[in-house]
A protein has these predicted regions:
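Small-residue helix-packing motif on alpha-helices
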Residues: 30, 40, 57, 73, ...
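NAD(P)+-binding Rossmann beta1-loop-alpha1 motif at the extreme N-terminus of oxidoreductases
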Residues: 1-52, 56-59, 129, 191-193
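NAD(P)-dependent Rossmann-like dehydrogenase/reductase catalytic/cofactor-binding core
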Residues: 205-260
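Short, well-ordered alpha-helices that flank and scaffold nucleotide-derived cofactor binding pockets
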Residues: 13, 17-21, 45, 78, ...
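Rossmann-like NAD(P)(H) cofactor-binding subdomain of soluble oxidoreductases
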Residues: 37, 46, 54-134
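Short acidic capping loops at alpha-helix termini that bridge into adjacent secondary structure
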Residues: 26-29, 87-89, 198
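Internal alpha-helical scaffold of NAD(P)-dependent oxidoreductase catalytic cores
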Residues: 102, 106-115, 131-167, 178-217, ...
Length: 260
């Protein structure tokens, strides 16, 4: 299987590296494109193929991933449309801000529309720790499975109906920034408590990693794990209550709703 990722920015570049690292698809079967050679320099160490020409890059691709900013999508589609083979090639979009109707309209060729699937990873795909959503539009279930298989080994993959794609984006793709903002805030608190900044970041990062590992290992609800730490009258419950008084849970929920 040959994959071409159009766009070597934060998400497209991270996906190319993560897929290569996962090892299911050889790096030599992955091509990533960009407008400038300097953007592509970092991919050589992974054995990923690079190109400055979107048209040439899609010719031999089985799956074409559109990973550019939404306002660049029409331009990219106009470039690759003449070369698309709708009977063979699948399109995967990383741009939920461009509707399926618009995207298929940009790509329609001689009355034919390609198999289209949307996929939303997050930037942790680069280190194979993404939460990636896959949602078919015109693709068959078998084609959707094929797209999902591309992301095997890059973290967790979940197939969802299209109506859940934007909420999923808020929860996981935007959500990684929210998680990092918590780490930043807790680290700043750690500095106030007397730790050097680099040590505080290390402590908080490992604590968050440990919390996630507990949920995965036990299959429990977060509150069950919280209960194991909150002894009556103890420090933890006092800290949690102080956070709630400051609006912690509501702030997180409002942030997720705001990013939807």
């Amino acid at each position: 299987m040959n994959i071409t990722i159009i766009g070597a920015g934060n998400m497209g570049g991270a996906a190319a590296i993560g897929i290569a690292r996962a090892g299911k698809i050889p790096a030599s079967c992955i091509t990533v494109t960009a407008r400038h050679a300097t953007t592509l320099a970092r991919f050589s160490e992974y054995g990923i193929r690079t190109s400055l020409d979107n048209v040439e890059a899609v010719k031999d691709a089985d799956i074409v991933v559109i990973a550019v900013k939404p306002w660049i999508v029409p331009e990219v589609c106009s470039q690759i449309r003449p070369l698309l083979d709708c009977s063979r090639q699948q399109i995967v979009s990383f741009a939920p801000g461009v509707s399926p109707e618009d995207l298929l309209g940009f790509l329609e060729k001689d009355g034919q529309k390609p198999a289209l699937t949307y996929s939303i990873p997050n930037t942790a795909i680069e280190v194979c720790q993404s939460m990636t959503f896959v949602s078919r539009v015109t693709a068959t279930p078998e084609q959707e499975d094929e797209v999902a298989s591309v992301f095997e080994g890059t973290g967790s993959v979940m197939k969802v109906p299209f109506k859940q794609l934007m909420p999923g984006t808020a929860l996981a793709s935007c959500g990684i920034a929210y998680a990092l903002r918590y780490i930043r805030a807790a680290s700043e608190g750690g500095v106030e408590l007397g730790f050097y900044a680099r040590d505080a970041v290390k402590i908080v990062s490992q604590t968050v990693k440990g919390a996630a590992a507990l949920l995965e290992a036990h299959g429990t609800h977060p509150e069950q794990e919280i209960d194991k730490v909150t002894t009556p009258g103890g420090l933890t419950i006092r800290g949690l209550n102080a956070m709630e008084k400051a609006g912690f849970t509501n702030a997180v929920i409002q942030g997720l709703k705001g990013g939807k």
